[in-house]
Amino acid sequence: MSILTLGPAGTYSHRVSLSFSDDIVFRNSVTAIVKDVSDGTFDKGIIPVENSIEGSVTESLSSLVDHDIAILEEVVAPIQHALLAQSATFDTITSHPQALAQCRNFITSNYPDLKLEPATSTASGIDRATEDDSIAAIGHPESSNEQLKILAKNIQDQSSNSTRFFVIAPPTKRQKLGEKTSVIIYPKSDYSGLLLKILQTFADQDINLTRIESRPSGNKLGDYLFHIDFEASSDESRTLEVFSNLHTIVSENGWVRSLGSYNVTHLS
């Protein structure tokens, strides 16, 4: 089965995808991946969702709101960054914005005056550095090639750097069993105690939240929706009670969307 993920070849998403299949198809944005999986063009995709240093990947969260999908699995992968260039002389460092941010301390300490150039992926940054000797790239150390040599390894700000990825599928593939469940809540209203009510309904059922994040709805300033991950299966009676209460809490124009249940895999 083909897996859709962020390209070009060599991205961290690509490396995670190879754990599932050798049949990989690339897109140049997370939004394109989620759209093509949501409408059934592809049966499976892999996207980055959250990094242990820089937090959530905002494009991924926005895409999960805009397109209906199922989460089949969560994959946690270690992220090790290296600085690669054709020589030790360059005037620009490029990579995906998340990678640049994850190596902020290294860049500030060693190259405070160089230009930082965002790329669509770590792999596309590697391609730029391969073509242009004035550019260095941040990416996986195995991205070195005949033109690019490794100038420094493990340059991420934290040695425990890791990223969560979601394996996604069309919404008809949602699962009821798994270690965790994800839900998106859009109250489309704002009043004192709203967030407390949402959190209390989980606490009343003794359900542990592993992540809660508010994101702008895009409709107007101050209007938010919530991404919540929690430790329970969709088919548990306590989860069904939570969903019932959440539907009651949101206004008539709001909505609650479960993305299904899934297990967690840790890669080494």
Locate the predicted segments by residue.
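Domain-level signature for soluble enzymes in the chorismate/prephenate branch of the shikimate pathway
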Residues: M1-S268
